[in-house]
Amino acid sequence: PTVYERMRVAEVFNGRLAMLAIVGCVYPELLGNGVWFEVWNKVDFYRFALISLQVVAPLEYWRGNGGFGWDGEEKYDRSYPGFDPCNLTTEYTKAAEIKNGRLAMIGMFGLEVQNHVTAQGPVANLIEHLRHPLAANIGANLAHPWPPVAMFATTGHKDGVWFPGAQPPAHLTGEYPADRGFDPLSVAADPTVYARMRVSEVFHARLSMLAIVGSIVPELLGKGAWFEVGNSVDGIKLGFILMAIAAPTEYWRGNGGFNWDKGTADRSYPGFDPLKLTTDYTKREIKNGRLAMTGLLGLTFQYLATGESPLANLAAHFANPVGANITTTLA
């Protein structure tokens, strides 16, 4: 029931956010102000993010420490805390909001895929479809040739490709560490996007490797499972402290820190390497980071499926390999 309650609140929250996002993705294009995926060409992302944090963080801190009376007897519904001057929170409007919110969340995912496949905005795609219904539609886009298959990997992919016999796309040359030639949707065809994705992958890989350690070591030391951390730590206060520390650094970094605007430094490896690890270990870092990101997803699904920690599941499996495994859980 506790998880279900949190999921219902999260669904309403993200549904509202997605509906606003749909309007924000379509309306500017209708007004001739550009498509949604070009917004960062006109807006300083780091300054925008910092302003958003400054506005949201105090409100979230107040909300998590008793705002709306949530710490008391839960008199208020977290999705509908009581502010309703137009009397819109009827049973009908609540159901309609959730349905439209779900549609908007799926729509946002569709806009992302549409951008990678057609490189056009939703309005431009709609106009093209109305002009040529038979030639411009999802079937025509899916019919475009995908990367061909060959018997051997092309020159440059020294570690081979992601699947035996697969032919990598032209924009994945094997130049960068752990490039296995996997990009069926040509997401990285744009060099600028590809550069940003490489930096993002290394960043999240490092974060995930730390998170894996933080998820297992405390349990080994008898400090509880990773999903119980919120019982001993004020998550809102911790998040606020982290944002207060990280925001100035991110703002400085986004405005020329490490000389990134001059293109003189690699964003993933800015030069701090006293142990000389950024030579032979970059490939291993990415591979282990990918494994860690997948592992974190596995820990989450494991908890949702069994309600137990990774070490508890491992101990149960060792005690009864036939009766405690993924097949028995799925059954």
Swiss-Prot record:
Alphabetic keyword roster: Chloroplast, Photosynthesis, Photosystem I, Plastid
Gene3D superfamilies reported in the protein's UniProt record: Chlorophyll a/b binding protein domain (1.10.3460.10)
Additional note from the record: The LH35 protein is synthesized as a 100 kDa polyprotein and is entirely imported into the chloroplast where it is subsequently cleaved into 5 mature 20 kDa LH35 proteins.
Origin superkingdom: Eukaryota
Alphabetical GO biological process terms: photosynthesis, light harvesting
Coiled coil regions, renumbered to chain: none
InterPro entries xref list: Chloro_AB-bd_pln (IPR001344), Chloroa_b-bind (IPR022796)
SUPFAM superfamilies reported in the protein's UniProt record: Chlorophyll a-b binding protein
Cellular compartment(s): Plastid, Chloroplast
Name of the protein described by the UniProt record: Light-harvesting complex I LH35 proteins
GO cellular component assignments: chloroplast; photosystem I
Matching Pfam families: Chloroa_b-bind
